[in-house]
């Protein structure tokens, strides 16, 4: 049976993984340094945390479910204990992209990240509809990259990732560089920033006298139908008035060179700021 050493097992992400690995075909050894995390594992899931040395002894796969800022240090601390052929799984592209993993050609590095439950979905169960992050009840897609290692290891890593992010719909294979374009580039630098602007726009119309709930209802409803048209979820076209508003509004809101956020140096700078 494949043995997994799960680092950060009692943390925010690690606890999700610890939960999802219950009943899986893997033997999981849980590593958690904080007392609160160890207690959470014990009382919530009935798991006892073990030392890093005990977890790594004979482990086939090591999952680093720790913050981006800690991955480099944790990886460096355990490198000497990793046997050739061990697979190291990281849950975000930032640290691998920034070069924070040890220079060990004899290890397999697999990077995976969730797409999170899509806005347009077929969920009917209320618990699934309220699972906005995913990995509990709501179905989601995922992306993965084999950064280094034998080609056969991709399927091995993908099988683990499908448990991590379960329930999974589509599984997309990308490179680490492409994953960095997706996050922080697409999802955070672009999408999150524009969503913050939308919230500020709601605040502005409220300050100008519109009822807050009315403003929220109006915006969120329009986001649904406008998004469905823009991304091809439904057949339809915008009104002439809407197209004219976009024509004149976009130059006011967006710099002409805004797409430079996807240039390699901009992606690298963004990742340096978070790692």
Residue map of PLM features:
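Short acidic low-complexity segments
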Residues: 45-59
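NAD(P)-dependent Rossmann-like dehydrogenase/reductase catalytic/cofactor-binding core
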Residues: 138, 210-275
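Rossmann-fold dinucleotide-binding core
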Residues: 91-183
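NAD(P)+-binding Rossmann beta1-loop-alpha1 motif at the extreme N-terminus of oxidoreductases
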Residues: 1-45
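Amphipathic alpha-helical segments within well-ordered protein domains
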Residues: 199-206
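A short glycine-threonine-serine/GTX helix/turn-capping micro-motif
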Residues: 183-192
